A protein has these predicted regions:
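Membrane-proximal intracellular helices of multi-pass ion channels
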Residues: 1-479
Length: 479
């Protein structure tokens, strides 16, 4: 393990976080809030520590995949610890455990909250909560690689370790250029949503924070009722953008380039949109009597399906009161998640496709034992390593899920609450059902259960392995 280079990169991460943390200070100045001093203190602390480490140049350039995974995992933990400090210092969230839970939930774009009264927070704290979604949505290392000329051949290791999905590719030969393209698309889409929300009558502060949550598919709201208080036009705009941010960003790159036709041929996007359409249709029919007309039922069904499958977590209504069939459909799409290469969480549609095709292949062998069938994605054969990786991910995911469920069950809450709490955190969704539903919160859990759920949030956002490697002794051996 090359500790010096990991420490050097962590220095850059803290420096970048300090720059981000100065923005809530500006918000505090605008609203004349004394809570902004907490952000200023922590921002200066991050900057001082970061600059001290950056100044110490590292000579060794040895950097393998394991260094990439460990660096990313440690970066997200350290970012969350420092990101939680302003909440504790300004007393918006006095408990460090609760503040850390809220911050990890923000950076991992989960949106699970321990707060019962969100509106009691200062504007600068509300802004930071939502801004952590935007930072975490695309990933801090994508941002880092886009603006800094990091050298040494380890850029791709960092990007692969942080990016959501079975694999991450390069749109162009250089990793740094790929990072720039990703962030350019991300920023433009965020700005377009802000403008549309403003034009629909949403106040500027609300437009900014809601757009940050939508872009990062996070779901922290600034109102206790989430998105329910806004008009249907605003809700419809958010619905559309949640779906757009759940699409593989490769599709947008293809649309901007000379391969526009290929963008519409992406198999994962077809499955993603088909699943959304099917889920919306089922829930619309199932809830039409609740909402008294088909259009209103469709409106809420579209919003909640978009919110859940993209793992955003916003809500326009208390879907925990919906019929059992509708609730079951939402739980299913919680697991499926968005597309790989998007800002969404969950298992990912691409993995679901590979799992389904693997099962189909195995069934085919029972009928025709001597047949040779190749699993394809976008008409391209998948390697045995890719298929094995998906299967290993699914097994690891299941083991973490079961272990987490068993541990938090010691708090003695009902099974639906516990099951959906793990589902909501491991898939980075936010709200679950029952006590952790749209009108509930995660403050009910004990400190031990909260730390387990924090682990789940980090594991889910980083695709399991970076966090798990931290607990592997052999990883920490020096080269």
């Amino acid at each position: 393990m090359n500790y010096s280079i990991i420490s050097y990169i962590l220095g850059w991460v803290l420096t970048i976080e300090s720059i981000f943390m100065f923005i809530p200070c500006i918000v505090a100045a605008i609203y004349r809030e004394k809570e902004g001093f907490a952000f200023l203190i922590v921002a200066l602390l991050c900057l001082a520590i970061g600059l001290l480490r950056i100044r110490k140049k590292t000579k060794s350039q040895v950097f393998y995949a394991k260094e990439g995974f460990v660096t990313v995992a440690l970066s997200w933990i350290i970012m969350s610890i420092f990101g939680a400090l302003p909440f504790v210092i300004n007393q918006d969230i006095p408990s460090f455990t609760d503040a850390l839970f809220e911050t990890i939930s923000g950076f991992t774009t989960t949106g699970a909250s321990i707060l019962s009264d969100v509106e009691a927070l200062s504007h600068c704290s509300l802004f930071w909560r939502s801004f952590t979604h935007w930072i975490g949505g695309m990933g801090v290392f994508v941002f880092l690689l886009a603006i800094l000329p990091l050298t040494g051949g380890y850029n791709m290791h960092l990007m692969r370790a942080e990016s959501p999905g079975p694999s991450v590719g390069k749109f162009v030969p250089k990793v740094r250029e790929t990072a720039k393209i990703l962030y350019a698309i991300y920023i433009v889409m965020t700005l377009v949503e802000i403008i549309l929300l403003l034009s629909a009558g949403m106040p500027l502060f609300d437009s900014l924070t809601v757009s940050f949550g939508t872009a990062g598919t996070g779901g922290f709201g600034i109102k206790n009722t989430s998105i329910a208080d806004y008009n249907m036009v605003i809700q419809a705009i958010i619905s559309i953008f949640m779906i757009l941010f759940g699409v593989n960003f490769c599709a947008y790159f293809l649309l901007l380039g000379n391969n526009k036709k290929d963008a519409f041929k992406l198999e994962e996007v077809h499955w993603y949109l088909t699943i959304i359409a099917g889920a919306v249709a089922i829930i619309t029919i199932n809830t039409k009597d609740m909402f008294h007309n088909l259009f209103t039922a469709f409106h809420h069904a579209l919003f909640q399906v978009a919110s859940v499958i993209t793992t955003t977590g916003y809500s326009t209504t208390d879907f925990d009161l919906w019929p059992q069939l509708s609730r079951a459909v939402l739980v299913i799409v919680m697991f499926i998640g968005a597309c790989a290469g998007s800002t969404g969480g969950g298992i990912k549609v691409s993995r679901i496709i590979i799992l389904v095709k693997s099962v189909k292949q195995e069934l085919g062998y029972f009928i025709h034992p001597r047949s040779v069938k190749v699993i394809k994605m976008d008409n391209k054969p998948l390697s045995a390593n890719s298929i094995r990786g998906v299967n290993a991910f699914f097994v690891t995911y299941t083991l973490i899920f079961v272990a987490s469920l068993l541990i938090i069950t010691f708090d003695n809450f009902d099974l639906v609450t516990n099951f959906t709490a793990v589902t909501a955190t491991l898939n980075n969704i936010g709200p679950g059902l029952k006590l952790v539903g749209p009108t509930g919160n995660f403050g009910i859990f004990s400190p031990v259960a909260k730390y387990i759920l924090m682990f789940d949030m980090l594991a889910g956002r980083l695709e399991l392995y970076p966090i798990l490697l931290l607990f592997t002794p052999s990883v920490w051996k020096k080269h």
